[in-house]
UniProtKB/Swiss-Prot annotation:
Alphabetical list of PANTHER family matching this protein: GLUTAMATE RACEMASE (PTHR21198:SF2)
Catalytic activity: L-glutamate = D-glutamate
Stored InterPro entries: Asp/Glu/hydantoin_racemase (IPR015942), Asp/Glu_race (IPR001920), Asp/Glu_racemase_AS_1 (IPR018187), Asp/Glu_racemase_AS_2 (IPR033134), Glu_race (IPR004391)
Binding of substrate, residues: 7-8, 39-40, 71-72, 181-182
Pathway the protein contributes to: Cell wall biogenesis; peptidoglycan biosynthesis
Active site per UniProt: 70, 180
EC number: 5.1.1.3
A Pfam family reported for this protein in Swiss-Prot or TrEMBL: Asp_Glu_race
Alphabetized UniProt keyword annotations: Cell shape, Cell wall biogenesis/degradation, Isomerase, Peptidoglycan synthesis
Highest taxon of the lineage: Bacteria
Protein name: Glutamate racemase
Organism per entry: Campylobacter jejuni subsp. jejuni serotype O:2 (strain ATCC 700819 / NCTC 11168)
Amino acid sequence: MKIGVFDSGVGGLSVLKSLYEARLFDEIIYYGDTARVPYGVKDKDTIIKFCLEALDFFEQFQIDMLIIACNTASAYALDALRAKAHFPVYGVIDAGVEATIKALHDKNKEILVIATKATIKSEEYQKRLLSQGYTNINALATGLFVPMVEEGIFEGDFLQSAMEYYFKNITTPDALILACTHFPLLGRSLSKYFGDKTKLIHSGDAIVEFLKERENIDLKNHKAKLHFYASSDVESLKNTAKIWLNLLRK
């Protein structure tokens, strides 16, 4: 099976890594719209337009499935993509919510959703969790994390200052939903900041389990072939994959 993975930039590499390590697919084509990142500050119509253009890009590869590894795109463009695509299209929000439900059986536990401004504004996570009976949900736009990841800043004083700024009035949550696929790249730093009490919900791990339960996919005895594309500076994208995620070998 050949699948496509789409993200606004390099953040979706966190989802790609989980899909790659799960050995569910024969070939994975990753496309990052790095020329127009971030999506989280753009309006709905623009996000849909960019996502439909990405869908057109994937048509040349004859993929069997498309994973939208971008929470903002999943929040605003999933219906439009499904209406146009001739193959299954999955977003990461349903998977993230499902993973949270599995992780937190006590619905009075505290949940913190961090994401781009657009994803928080969509209230997709908040509405879905409230509908499942969760009562203690905070949502916080932490958009500065996106360009930091794009620039390869995964730890250090600058990130520490940003976390202290964003989380200064936040009590330690029981679950932290990383509702932007850039944010798992900051996972080690976020775990260190909040401590062992906080369970991190990772879009990549969540989508793997989500797909296993919904698609008839056999485990492969080989790892998938990877192909990387970007709307600008594909070498930088490949470098991030190689250095941080260890996806590419020299």
